[in-house]
Amino acid sequence: MEPLGNWRSLRAPLPPMLLLLLLQVAGPVGALAETLLNAPRAMGTSSSPPSPASVVAPGTTLFEESRLPVFTLDYPHVQIPFEITLWILLASLAKIGFHLYHKLPTIVPESCLLIMVGLLLGGIIFGVDEKSPPAMKTDVFFLYLLPPIVLDAGYFMPTRPFFENIGTIFWYAVVGTLWNSIGIGVSLFGICQIEAFGLSDITLLQNLLFGSLISAVDPVAVLAVFENIHVNEQLYILVFGESLLNDAVTVVLYNLFKSFCQMKTIETIDVFAGIANFFVVGIGGVLIGIFLGFIAAFTTRFTHNIRVIEPLFVFLYSYLSYITAEMFHLSGIMAITACAMTMNKYVEENVSQKSYTTIKYFMKMLSSVSETLIFIFMGVSTVGKNHEWNWAFVCFTLAFCLMWRALGVFVLTQVINRFRTIPLTFKDQFIIAYGGLRGAICFALVFLLPAAVFPRKKLFITAAIVVIFFTVFILGITIRPLVEFLDVKRSNKKQQAVSEEIYCRLFDHVKTGIEDVCGHWGHNFWRDKFKKFDDKYLRKLLIRENQPKSSIVSLYKKLEIKHAIEMAETGMISTVPTFASLNDCREEKIRKVTSSETDEIRELLSRNLYQIRQRTLSYNRHSLTADTSERQAKEILIRRRHSLRESIRKDSSLNREHRASTSTSRYLSLPKNTKLPEKLQKRRTISIADGNSSDSDADAGTTVLNLQPRARRFLPEQFSKKSPQSYKMEWKNEVDVDSGRDMPSTPPTPHSREKGTQTSGLLQQPLLSKDQSGSEREDSLTEGIPPKPPPRLVWRASEPGSRKARFGSEKP
């Protein structure tokens, strides 16, 4: 018996995990799964002495000897990750199948199709096993599936329209949620007082709690529907922003009423504490999100040597903000939204382009997978035995949800329109009220109710599922035809060009200046103040210095400098026609506008002049938004190529004589009142005294000097001996020179020279008066022949005897 005693002494302190390892190595293959499941339980509960069969002799092993298996099946070992992978694969294949037929997602929202797939799977599971399918746990929803969706929504949210409408969004989210919660709760409590319905055991606080959770407008359902109808940006940001902040308010009200239901007596101080908790939860979540967003930006400032881990910080800090807020019982939705918006502004400038692309794709992938799993599990969890049907409670719940939602939107809009520059129209109000879709937030909160405190929990679950399915299926399917029927303004699908964005920024600065002069503190005023504070403090602290510029922009800068040097060397600058000279030559016949057209123009201006400009495209979950810097760089490169192509084409159209003259001429532009060297000043005096310029020539704004000497020719009637170069006034038509025409022009008469005046201006502005140029245009304008621009009076260095003008005769 001594060996048995030795075995007992060895077996007593043996850890259970070591026994499991021994079972895996030496146990029979067929009984491996059963051994893994039952071995710890048998070890922990067995207290009987071992049987004689278990006693082993010295030198023998405890287990029977087994051979090496060829094939082994161990499903319990990988059950959880295997099933999760299959669910995600099934959801992804379902989405691929929906989008194979392009017309199906435009008719039926994707959320409806996913719920139908979940209902089908739940029915199959319930029919085979005759048990309720596994319901999604609320902790799994709130801790793992909801954060990626909110992170994606906050990170890619158009921040400027959001902050321009922040007052209206908070008005709908806070006051509107209180309106709906209290209205639905009190109305349902009135229905419960009717004894015929059998609902007298439901108290007022329970109805208020149910009203708060049923008022949750789900951003997942809203995004799934509104991404396909492409409404205008203002309407989209109002509905989406309200649904995002509405969830945070709903969760706060839910926890508040849940705490009241668990109290035996409620005092006045508890009510004030609940109101204070309402603001603390929301503001605390925002502060946590902004703080961790700043830390993320500061961390990525030092990752320029380790680019691989840059995307990791974005997801870690955002998820850390969510779980930190939940740890302190603050609003995790507000925290992760604020963190995402902060990182979008600062982190993007620190990370590389490849890291930014990784962040975008991975974030879109996580949110799409989470959204798909939520809708499928909603359908699966619907099928089961956890329902209680009551016609009165279910029907009145649906009616009160629709009624209080519509009343709340119309009443609150009448108040907020008094403070809005752009009032919301009746069509916008109707779409906002119609877009109050319920979804996963409401579904998870109703399953989270404790059954001990709420004996009619199954009735609440049934009513919530009916409201969710009605809003997602009926309202979600019919909202697109309604938008088309009401002719609601759609989103602008055209991307802004670089010039348009420059003009938009110019208008912003102008409006900021106007507000500053008027003493009005509007959006532009506060945006300008924040930008100054951001440039002075935040960007210096959070953004890495010596940021590398885009290679395309640097290449464009080098090409422009090289092209400018070539133009200066070849004299092409002096021959390029100016906009002012072309504009003076162009005569357009403007048709008189009729009174009906004038009224139509006024109506269009009054409707669209002060509208918020469409700066971004509508949200689309299945495609990524174009990067602004990449689009601008591409446009700059395209414009550069186009300008080079036009310059080459224009240069090739010049005749050979003009090319020869421009290649040998050198022009120098001097500003007004520039002191010339003594020799040049002497020559200019001789030229003016010679009668080749008028008194107004001395007041010219710009002097163009041709420094290339021409052929020397002398006229005896002007000079008795050979004299050095002097400066003469020449008439030069820039448009004819540029277009390569050989049409001779008549030199101006002395009378016209005396009549013409020079105006101070830039190098390429016309130097003739309007009357003189107009008279010449009348003579030259004929049908089918474009008008000739007026000649241009310039200083030119030439030989005194040279009377040959560029556009004149050589007669002495």
Curated annotation (Swiss-Prot):
Biological processes annotated in GO: epithelial cell differentiation; monoatomic ion transport; potassium ion transmembrane transport; protein localization; regulation of intracellular pH; sodium ion import across plasma membrane
Family according to the record: Belongs to the monovalent cation:proton antiporter 1 (CPA1) transporter (TC 2.A.36) family.
Cellular location(s): Apical cell membrane
Record organism: Homo sapiens (Human)
Quaternary structure, from the entry: Interacts with CHP1 and CHP2.
Compositional bias of kind Low complexity: 686-701
Biased composition regions of type Polar residues, renumbered to the chain: 757-772
Biased composition (Basic and acidic residues): 648-660
GO molecular function ontology, one term from the record: potassium:proton antiporter activity
Bilayer-crossing regions: 80-100, 107-127, 138-158, 169-189, 209-229, 237-257, 278-298, 308-328, 361-381, 392-412, 430-450, 459-479
Residues carrying a glycan: N350
Keywords noted in UniProt: Antiport, Cell membrane, Glycoprotein, Ion transport, Membrane, Phosphoprotein, Sodium, Sodium transport, Transmembrane, Transmembrane helix, Transport
UniProt keyword Glycoprotein present: yes
GO cellular component: apical plasma membrane; membrane; plasma membrane
Chain spans, region Disordered: 648-701, 733-812
Catalytic activity annotation: Na(+)(in) + H(+)(out) = Na(+)(out) + H(+)(in)
Record's protein name: Sodium/hydrogen exchanger 2
Function: Plasma membrane Na(+)/H(+) antiporter. Mediates the electroneutral exchange of intracellular H(+) ions for extracellular Na(+). Major apical Na(+)/H(+) exchanger in the base of the colonic crypt. Controls in the colonic crypt intracellular pH (pHi) to direct colonic epithelial cell differentiation into the absorptive enterocyte lineage at the expense of the secretory lineage.
Membrane topology: Multi-pass membrane protein
Tissue/organ expression: Expressed in skeletal muscle, colon and kidney. Lower levels in the testis, prostate, ovary, and small intestine. In the distal colon, expressed along the cryptal axis.
